[in-house]
């Protein structure tokens, strides 16, 4: 797999490796097949991810398993109200001799080897910290100590504290748009999986659980090259292009599209969002999904499979409806699918 070969053989090798990667990750987390598939899509689409879910559903375990399967370095930081932007880059302390010392922070500690960076409870950090993180996400580089550091293989994952609202700073819409996906994680609903998580001691030791994942299933240093090859290999027929544009139009202008939701003024519902960048992200993710399914062309199901996670957080509602966002946006997306005919 690590020796790149031209054409379909190379992508077939990597698709087989991606399937093995998913199987390895599933050893560490139970009942999260959809989240694993979406994370795999994000990895090969070279996009950053916001994880949504309650405390204790396995977000950290999942990301540690992903980092091990990818190879490269894993770093995690906890968002706090007193965090400064520089805390991501370096930290200072007094040495035993009383002199100040400066050491690299979590972003620089492993530099080019950093493949997974997890920002836990990102909304506890202040906007200044968000700004630096977003720059690192966009440019995969940062300037410090009179030089520029590059992170060509970096993938940023973050999650938000959805329960406690004191001393939190919600990311503005423009910041959330930088994330390719927002992926929800819930406790498994399957009774067997629930019993295993509670009663099987194997799932109580996350360190050992993570070690069961085969290391370096994917060569993280080559994913950028493969990601580009995937985008060029997967074609979209004119009918699919028209379908994507139709979904986009109906999402941002649901009233004129004939969509109706009970008790909602559809002409006032959507304030903005769903930019061309967001729709380009949608197609990028859909192409990866098609590749994982063994096709070199897009079908409507590729678009629909990633649409909620890629587009939902990019829709900005009127303030009067924002408090009901968790209910309204899924209903809106379902109505969009029902209204826009698939080719």
Swiss-Prot record:
Compartment(s) of residence: Cytoplasm
Family in the record: Belongs to the MoxR family.
GO cellular component assignments: cytoplasm
Name of protein: Protein MoxR
Protein's gene: moxR
Primary localization class, coarse: cytoplasm
Organism: Methylorubrum extorquens (strain ATCC 14718 / DSM 1338 / JCM 2805 / NCIMB 9133 / AM1) (Methylobacterium extorquens)
One Pfam family cited in the UniProt record for this chain: AAA_3
Function: May be involved in the regulation of formation of active methanol dehydrogenase.
